[in-house]
């Protein structure tokens, strides 16, 4: 699919001006811009939350494996003592 031509863009712009009026267009653009900004911010925060959850899970796994190693070493040393 090819991008719209200049003529098509001008017709779309004219329809928008007729529907909303010239005074409302800056307000609509501002609202659209802030909406996009908020969406990007939410996506970034979600990615950061997911990353921190992954880091926490990996830290828990590392701690569990260390605890298992310590427990195994302790059990082995008790067996050697008897």
Swiss-Prot record:
Membrane-traversing stretches: 1-21
Annotated spans, Disordered: 42-82
Keywords: Cell inner membrane, Cell membrane, Membrane, Protein transport, Translocation, Transmembrane, Transmembrane helix, Transport
GO molecular function, a single term: protein transmembrane transporter activity
Any one cellular-component term (Gene Ontology): TAT protein transport complex
InterPro entries for this protein: TatA/B/E (IPR003369), TatA/E (IPR006312)
Domain of life: Bacteria
Gene Ontology biological process terms in this record: protein transport by the Tat complex
Residue ranges with Basic and acidic residues bias: 63-82
Subcellular location: Cell inner membrane
Membrane topology: Single-pass membrane protein
Subunit structure comment from the entry: The Tat system comprises two distinct complexes: a TatABC complex, containing multiple copies of TatA, TatB and TatC subunits, and a separate TatA complex, containing only TatA subunits. Substrates initially bind to the TatABC complex, which probably triggers association of the separate TatA complex to form the active translocon.
Annotated function: Part of the twin-arginine translocation (Tat) system that transports large folded proteins containing a characteristic twin-arginine motif in their signal peptide across membranes. TatA could form the protein-conducting channel of the Tat system.
Family affiliation: Belongs to the TatA/E family.
Annotated protein name in UniProt: Sec-independent protein translocase protein TatA
Organism of origin: Helicobacter hepaticus (strain ATCC 51449 / 3B1)
Upper lineage: Bacteria, Pseudomonadati, Campylobacterota, Epsilonproteobacteria, Campylobacterales
